A protein has these predicted regions:
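Conserved, well-structured interaction surfaces
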Residues: 34-49, 74-145, 153-167, 171-188, ...
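Short coil/turn linking the two alpha-helices of tandem helical-hairpin repeats
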Residues: 139-141, 146, 184, 215-224, ...
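Short, surface-exposed recognition loops and adjoining beta-strand edges that mediate ligand/DNA contacts
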Residues: 57-66, 182-204, 218-299, 424-437
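Bacterial Sec-dependent N-terminal signal peptides
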Residues: 1-38, 169, 210, 398, ...
């Protein structure tokens, strides 16, 4: 793998702070590294590697937001204990490694000889998609973050505001949307048509834009930022979501039933028409390689983990009670109850607790373990991390339409998802709050599957009612000071010996008091 001099991106963030091991010996390395497309491919592949491995930067918020009744080790984290969150030591290192590589490509692609217009668009489009996705994720999890101009300027960077980070994401996502083809026409670094939806395309760029604009408007409302026109942002979200739903950005469609969805999610090699963007489970990287879907692995238990028995249900990292699922799906005809949960109509009681047994992901990967009675040990759920699928876009459009007062449009999108599940259309008995109904529909649709719930809670302003522990009692000053975001990683300010390497980056006020 090539090595580059990190021009101090001095975002200490990227050098010492982000611990980037990318130090070229001289400028000649830059010139030589991009002279042919084969060399350019190395950088594009590195961007994809970091894109596939950056989710650890957001893990604490994923766990805080999950719908769960019990956890094995994360009770204090989910209660919002500041010191526990700080000790979780989430670090945005890999996100900024990805950002650096994307900027590096944009800085140097002009040196690549013999590059066709299509190949130029592919490589530049991948870089812009990665930058858009990276800044989107940073704006959600950390709020304030560093926006780097390029990979060559020697200077220190301070934190930008959340809205500035969102706007940076939008700027790059728009460029990716304009440059990239639909997924079916996408040719990767090998020159072959893409076989996995892990690459930037017109469809997932549009989905990224729909999420960025929804987040922009929602954060303006949450933080009372009157300089941002929230409704204009919601209209843009609806615009890009509609492009995806209407087939303008690729041929995506809802699968027929929740059970069929589970079968497709459980097969990394399946062609899932609902899938828009995924992080691929690459088992070839080693015997200890696991799925990027942390959520699916947190809920993994018997019977998918065949080394366990029903009596081990109480030992799963995250657990749900049957009563919680009955409340979440009040309609007994909702097919998601029996598709997403194993033998849902049968009780699975352990030590007096009747558990719902996760079954959305149905296959596992095991390693040989001669010391185990079964001769094997559970390694991972066998699944790609399908980060966005079409149902997400329908419900995001419904949410933004409801905020804009388009009750008819929001209801239609909500009921499209309910219809697939065989559930009663909105408004069902007792339903009168459309916005809350859409939020709960997202819970029903994405339970056990992804990290969306924490951010759904924030977009809708439900942090006082849907989160526990310290969250309901947070003051306006706490929230303005960063309480709903992760603390800025210490590596952004100091080296491994504690020496300050970037005095422009300051910890958010809420977190500073606990350090």
């Amino acid at each position: 793998m090539k090595r580059y001099i990190l021009p101090a991106l001095a975002l200490s963030l990227l050098a010492s702070s982000c611990k980037l091991d990318l130090t070229p010996e001289n400028a000649i390395t830059y010139s030589n590294a991009f002279s042919t497309e084969a060399e350019l491919n190395t950088t594009t592949s590195t961007i994809h590697f970091y894109l596939d491995n950056c989710m650890d930067a957001f893990s604490p918020l994923t766990k805080i937001g999950l719908l769960a009744d019990e956890t094995q080790d994360d009770g204090q984290l989910r209660e919002g204990n500041p010191r526990t969150i700080i000790q979780a030591a989430a670090d945005w290192e890999y996100v900024y490694r990805m950002i650096f590589e994307a900027n590096l490509l944009l800085d140097n692609i002009g040196k690549t000889q013999g590059l066709s217009e299509d190949r130029y668009a592919y490589h530049v489009g991948q870089a812009h998609f990665a930058l858009g996705f990276g800044y989107f994720m940073l704006s959600r999890a950390y709020g304030q973050a560093v926006i780097t101009a390029n990979a060559k300027d020697l200077k220190l960077y301070g934190l930008s505001t959340q809205q500035q980070v969102i706007d940076a994401g939008i700027e790059h996502a728009l460029k990716a949307f304009e440059l990239l083809p639909t997924y079916d026409k996408l040719r990767t670094t090998s020159g072959n048509l893409a076989t996995y939806k892990q690459y930037g395309s017109k469809g997932n760029s549009a989905t990224l834009l729909a999420h960025l604009y929804a987040w922009k408007g929602s954060m303006a409302e949450l933080y009372g930022d009157t300089s941002v026109d929230a409704n204009a942002a919601y209209r843009k979200s609806v615009e890009y979501a509609s492009k995806v739903i209407n087939g303008e950005t690729g041929a995506y469609s809802l699968v027929s039933t929740p059970d069929q969805l589970c079968q497709l999610l459980s097969d990394p090699n399946a062609s899932n028409p609902e899938e828009i963007f995924s992080l691929v489970y690459d088992k070839s990287r080693g015997n200890e390689s696991t799925s990027k879907n942390e959520v699916a692995n947190l809920f993994a238990t018997w019977p998918v983990n065949s080394t366990l028995t029903q009596g081990d249900l109480a030992q799963a990292a995250f657990r749900l009670k049957k009563s919680t699922i009955e409340k979440l799906y009040p309609d007994a005809d909702d097919a998601r109850r029996t598709a997403f949960f194993y033998e849902f109509d049968t009780d699975h009681e352990v030590s007096g607790v009747n558990y719902a047994v996760p079954y959305k992901f149905r296959n596992a990967v095991f390693t040989v373990d001669q010391s185990a009675e079964s001769g094997k040990s559970f390694l991972s759920i066998n699944a790609n991390y399908v980060y966005w699928r079409l149902a997400d876009v329908y419900l995001l459009r419904a949410e933004c339409s409801a905020k804009l007062g388009d009750t008819s449009g929001a209801t239609s999108d909500l009921n499209r998802i309910r219809s697939r599940a065989g559930a009663t259309a909105y408004p069902a008995a007792g339903e009168s709050d459309l916005k809350k109904a859409i939020f709960h529909e997202r819970e029903r649709e994405f339970i056990l599957e992804n990290d969306s719930r924490y951010y759904d809670i924030l977009r809708n302003g439900y942090h006082r009612t849907e989160l526990t522990g310290k969250f309901p009692s947070l003051t306006a000053a706490d929230i303005a000071g960063g309480a709903l975001c992760l603390p800025i990683p210490s590596s952004a300010q100091r080296d491994k010996d504690g020496k300050v390497i970037n005095g422009l980056i300051l910890q958010r006020p809420y977190w500073f008091r606990y350090m």
